[in-house]
Amino acid sequence: MIGVAWMVIAASLLGCSAFAEVTETFKIVNWNVLYGFNHKKSVKQGANWIKKQAADVVALQELNGHNQVGFKELASEWGHDHAAILKKGGFPVGLTSNKPIEVIERRVKDFHHGYLHCKTHGIHFFVVHFWPGKYWEADWILDKTAPLIERGEKVVILGDFNGNSRKDEDFLIANATLRKRDYTFVDKVEAKGFVDIVHKHDPEAKISQPSPITIPRWTKDLKELKLKRYRIDFVFADKSFAEQSHSGTISLAREIETISDHYPVIVEFNGALSP
């Protein structure tokens, strides 16, 4: 009895830390950074914003002007020692992580922008930048994910979809009157059981693009901007892994508006993951 009493006292003094299960949080940021962070004018500001998020994995699109060496150096500014970029030139996508990255495939052939398939933290990441109307790009990637999911692997598809979600339809009809609605990419992904993490946790988050940085080059004024705003940037997780998610949203921070025309997607999962 004395031994049990001492255990109870010790547990209370330690805040029960020795007896409680520790739950880790895993954080992902996905962001289209507008021609390499506003045509490379806002690289430092973009890196600083990412650093403040303290994410475990960062997926980026439109890394124009960056190559593998430079991208790895840039990733170190937000505390990531590991980075992979799709290609040199054009509109590359990339992935950074605070754990080692295994590059499984860099696919450019037959794609408009291409995609990057990497594994880090025990998760398969497909970083995409779909081209409007090329729906078979999604089919190709989904064919790649099918055997992974059958084996019980964790899979995330994330990036700029250049398409919409039917879950946003009411918002789109009422607000994005200057946009055409195209649900095909998202329909295909959801038909395979993938879960839209932002909609799961923050169904009111309907805007990921454009920001006021598009004025006046691509947008006349704020009035027109409001009629163009919609959500085309997504993080999808396979059904099983999605059960571990505990938050998902889109940051509309004012500082983003001098860095990119897209707003970043931020999602978090519970539980310790594999290295």
Predicted regions and their residues:
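Bacterial N-terminal signal peptides
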Residues: G3-G15
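Intrinsically disordered, low-complexity serine/threonine-rich segments
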Residues: G15, F19-A20, L74
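Active-site regions of metal-assisted phosphoester/phosphodiester hydrolases
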Residues: A20-W49, L95-P275
